[in-house]
Amino acid sequence: PRLNAAGRMDTAAVALKLLLCENEEQAAGIAARLSEINTSRQQAEQQIAAAALEKLSADPARVLDRVIVVSGEGWHPGVIGIVATRLMEKYGRPSIVISTENGEGRGSGRAPTSFNLHAALCACAPLLLRFGGHSAAAGLTIEEEKIGAFRKAINDWAAKEYPVPKPLPLKLDAVADIAELTVPAVQELSRLAPFGSGNPVPVFLLQNAAVDGIWPLGSEGRHCRIRLRQGGAACFVSLFGTAPDDLPYRMGTAVDAAVEVSIFQGRGGPMVSCHCCAMRPAGLGNAPAEQAARFDAFLSGTAL
């Protein structure tokens, strides 16, 4: 994240300089600078995400759109793609975040595998100054005064091409026990890197794990850190976008959790980090996602 933050917030040359540096003292200084840049990236991301969610909360009908389109003045263009991903994960539908300045908007969109974002933008091309990307991610430039018309056009197209909303698909690579998530095992997964659109990060399903602890995460407590337990084995998972008070699972609840695993360097050495992609009561399978999709279709007036 620190290397990526340089290109998002400053210049990628800072990250390149660190990778090429052969002097340990100079490298430490550059690394410290990258940490500062990454902190700025995190703050900008949190501020823009909060502003976007506030706009959507003020107009609840927009959350029922097939494609979420939200814009704001002066949002940092380097992080709007990350915010679009957060909105897509939260609402389970394609999301486009647009930063406006001097009458022009620069947007970044993300979409689940069930939706072709590039095809949607092609259908709206007359309203755009330029655009590019692929089915899952795209960027665009638009005149600010046309954002409203663009929102209507892309949702009209989506309603025609995708008449019944589908739940956000989540591909699981394997079922795992918490006891199997050891540092050596997770380190082996790095041999599958680099990860990206054509080679996504592996997702593991932890079944029938008990919620054994819940703590706020982040400077403002907008996220959760949850301890899950299976017998004598336990792990900590991070759930972003959900505060502890909003978590529907209490202590002792049995859940199924889909997680991405990675290694981070803690004070005591390498440790396993788990990011929770989805969580639901144990044993329910796909029922909650399918029911949510049907309910959204009902609210938006779609024939069931």
Set out the residue ranges of the language-model regions.
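Flexible, glycine/threonine-enriched loop-and-boundary segments that flank and lead into catalytic domains
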Residues: 54, 58-85
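Acidic, two-metal ion nucleic-acid-processing modules in DNA metabolism proteins
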Residues: 1-53, 89, 109-304
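Residues immediately flanking
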Residues: 72, 85, 100, 144, ...
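Long, contiguous hydrophobic alpha-helical segments, chiefly transmembrane helices and signal peptides
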Residues: 79-80, 105, 257
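General beta-strand structural signal in soluble alpha/beta enzymes
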Residues: 70-71, 97-98, 130, 257
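Short, glycine/serine-rich, charged loops/turns that create anion-binding
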Residues: 23, 74, 102
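Short glycine-cluster motifs
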Residues: 96-111
